[in-house]
Swiss-Prot record:
It comes from Porphyromonas gingivalis (strain ATCC BAA-308 / W83). It is found in: Cytoplasm; Secreted; Cell surface. The gene is eno. This is Enolase. Its cofactor is Mg(2+). Its EC number is 4.2.1.11. One of its GO terms (biological process) is glycolytic process. Belongs to the enolase family. Keywords: Cytoplasm, Glycolysis, Lyase, Magnesium, Metal-binding, Secreted.
Amino acid sequence: MEIAKIIGREILDSRGNPTVEVDVHLACGIIGRAAVPSGASTGENEAIELRDQDKARYCGKGVLKAVKNVNEVIDPALCGMSVLEQTAIDRKLIELDGTKTKSNLGANAMLGVSLAVAKAAAAYLDIPLYRYIGGSNTYVLPVPMMNIINGGSHSDAPIAFQEFMIRPVGACCFREGLRMGAEVFHALKKVLHDRGLSTAVGDEGGFAPALNGTEDAIESILKAVEAAGYVPGKDITIAMDCASSEFFKDGIYDYTKFEGEKGKKRSIDEQVAYLTELVGKYPIDSIEDGMSENDWEGWKKLTVALGDKVQLVGDDLFVTNVEFLRRGIAEKCGNSILIKVNQIGTLTETLNAIEMAHRHGFTSVTSHRSGETEDTTIADIAVATNSGQIKTGSLSRTDRMAKYNQLLRIEEELGPCAVYGYKKV
């Protein structure tokens, strides 16, 4: 079970940008492999991914420095350690880096190693990754939050909000939920096509048409839900990722950044009122980053207004970090945390954030990034932690479907023990 060799390499993600892949070799011959995702809209408090900044290679986005850190710094430090000591290994990685933001080794280097170690350990014990991470009390299949219309930084569509998602909450199992989502996705394609709108897809596999703002996006989705034969609000609900940090400046939520002259400029109170209006008008049950990461007062106001009605998910606000989550719990900001493994940089710290959230009555949503790979680790993490919810894109692009297909396999493996669902706020 000893780690014999750790090898890092540069591969490409779903956007054609370099990322880190790591192989952890055990003395017995077993190998664990993990690839690291990357985000487009990032919270300013996220752990730092190390990029080469060499404009002559990959427009400065190469990761050879991070790979070198894996091969020349991390490998000699971890060789000989037991692969089953995940917490000790992650602690060693944090000590080796020595910075709060993981800017020395790079969060991409550290995460690749951390996840590959877990995969090698699961393979050594001959058990599924979700079982290794979560133990015997692992049985909840997540409700998929499917990003079928992309806006904001994830597309060229003139919509400020970044993601419009469907949640098949009325399904009896994950398999049926996935089918419902796929049928709505195809119905939406026809709705857009019939309007003469583009059906090209964005980074996360959702459509990126030139719609007339937020309400048009939501109403197009509702039309597709009904066309697919489902009841909005009963079978399928709507979730949004506003990514408000992307257009918040000097106390103003400036929609013109993405929507041009037709966009509005809203004060903090007006932003809260607008989101409250949308929730009253449409079957929305989850809002992510409705307020900016730097607008803690706005978050408090939004939680007072909507916290007992919908799930208010902190992504940029919490960045999968117990320090920021602790503040959010104390100040009553939000009621849910988005979990992105590369925001914090190790598996142990990720699990600590999920545990803290659940302990204080928060829900958690396991999430991909806009720059993904064929790696399916987050599917196993979602089941391992019984989070009951996963964000991993739309119903297109293999980098997204890989996670959904892994969840189908896990549900089949769990058999009658599998439960589909999430904790309602």
